[in-house]
């Protein structure tokens, strides 16, 4: 599985987080000009033989990370999350300064109880909280000064990554047409 080793995936920030960081940059309306980063391998790895697989693990019924290896691709990716050969960070934090004066904190943790993306944006006109999970459920909550709250539940578009793949292609072609 290429999400286990730096030799195949330099970091999960580059492999997975880049999509969320791109969205964060869009929210912030600027370009990062300074970044401080930290992270580590603090939960997974370091315990089991690198050859151990979910398909023949004696703890399969009790392991929350058990993968049912039904397809050939799944069988290739059913390596134990506790394997000693894992060397990628399982958590990372970024402090980002933007060229427009805004700042952001980005945290990525791969051992949370759920698989979600959550954003909280603060500004002088209120707070926006956004939640997205892997099933394409979206919730956006806007809280204004004084306490009024508005909730939005956008309907995801069809297609890869909740419709964003085709929207990226459209934006790319529009940028070409606009000479950007």
Give the residues covered by each predicted segment.
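Short beta-strand segments enriched in hydrophobic/aromatic residues
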Residues: 39, 98, 108-110
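Short Gly/Pro-enriched turn/cap motifs at secondary-structure boundaries
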Residues: 12-15, 82-87, 109-110, 161
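Generic preference for well-ordered secondary structure
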Residues: 7-8, 19, 78-80, 105-106, ...
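Short, flexible, glycine/charge-rich loop motifs used to bind or transfer phosphoryl groups or to couple energy/partner
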Residues: 25-26, 83-84, 94, 110, ...
């Amino acid at each position: 599985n290429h999400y286990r080793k730096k030799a195949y995936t330099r970091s999960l920030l580059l492999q997975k987080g880049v999509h969320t960081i791109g969205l964060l940059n869009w929210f912030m309306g600027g370009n990062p000009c300074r970044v401080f980063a930290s992270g580590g391998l603090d939960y997974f790895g370091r315990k089991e033989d690198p050859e151990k697989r979910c398909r023949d693990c004696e703890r399969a019924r009790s392991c929350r990370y058990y993968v049912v290896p039904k397809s050939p691709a799944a069988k290739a990716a059913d390596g134990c999350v506790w394997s000693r050969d894992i060397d990628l960070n399982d958590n990372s934090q970024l402090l980002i300064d933007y060229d427009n004066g805004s700042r952001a904190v980005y945290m990525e943790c791969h051992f949370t109880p759920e698989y979600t993306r959550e954003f909280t944006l603060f500004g002088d006109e209120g707070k926006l909280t956004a939640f997205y999970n892997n099933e394409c459920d979206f919730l956006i909550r806007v809280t204004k000064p004084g306490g009024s709250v508005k909730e939005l539940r956008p309907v995801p578009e069809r297609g890869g990554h909740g419709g964003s793949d085709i929207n990226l292609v459209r934006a790319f072609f529009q940028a070409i047409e606009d000479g950007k």
